[in-house]
Structure formats: C-alpha cells, structure tokens
Amino acid sequence: MARNVFCAYLKQEAEGLDFQLYPGELGKRIFDSISKQAWAEWIKKQTMLVNEKKLNMMNPEHRQLLETEMVNFLFEGKEVHIEGYVPVESK
C-alpha cells in the first residue's frame, strides 16, 4: 500500500517515497515530506546540474553544492538556475 505525505514541494498530499533515499537527518526530512513526483523533478534538475557544471561527486565541495541546491529546490521553492538552459514552451 502506498504511503501518502504532505509534500513540501507540491504543497499537497501525494504518494510518498518507498524508502529513505538520502542519508542522515536531511534524508529523514525528505522521506517524511517529499513525494515521489517532487523527487523525480529534483532528479531531473540534479542531472542537469551535474552535467552542465561538470560536478564530480568525489569532490566534497561539489556534493555540498548539490545538497544546497536540493534543499533550496525541494523545501524553499527556489528554482535551480542552469546557465544557458531555456525551458521548452508548452503548447
């Protein structure tokens, strides 16, 4: 049976994650208040960030940057800025 959470990103009730995907207290916070849909949106942004900024996940500074962007995106409603990226307009 799916578990529902009040998603901090979507600001509505939605299907929650199946298990904790990120370690520590932040991981618990994500598990308790981020939906599958919001997490999928973050993964898209994360992939773009890693590729465009050429981030190396072995570098602690790059991991910290990604974590900061994740918190800003999921909990503070801040859009991820990727230089040169222009979203395709929906028709």
UniProtKB/Swiss-Prot annotation:
**InterPro entries reported for this sequence:** Fe_traffick_prot_YggX, Fe_traffick_prot_YggX_sf
Q: What does this protein do?
A: Could be a mediator in iron transactions between iron acquisition and iron-requiring processes, such as synthesis and/or repair of Fe-S clusters in biosynthetic enzymes.
Cross-referenced HAMAP family: Fe_traffic_YggX (MF_00686)
Query: Among its keywords, does the record have Iron?
Result: yes
NCBIfam families linked to this entry: PRK05408.1
**Which PANTHER family does the entry mention?**
FE(2+)-TRAFFICKING PROTEIN-RELATED (PTHR36965:SF1)
**Top-rank lineage group of the source organism:** Bacteria
**Which keywords fit this entry according to its UniProt record?**
Iron
Q: Which SUPFAM superfamilies does this UniProt record tie to the protein?
A: YggX-like
Q: Which GO terms describe its molecular function?
A: iron ion binding
Q: Which protein is depicted?
A: Probable Fe(2+)-trafficking protein
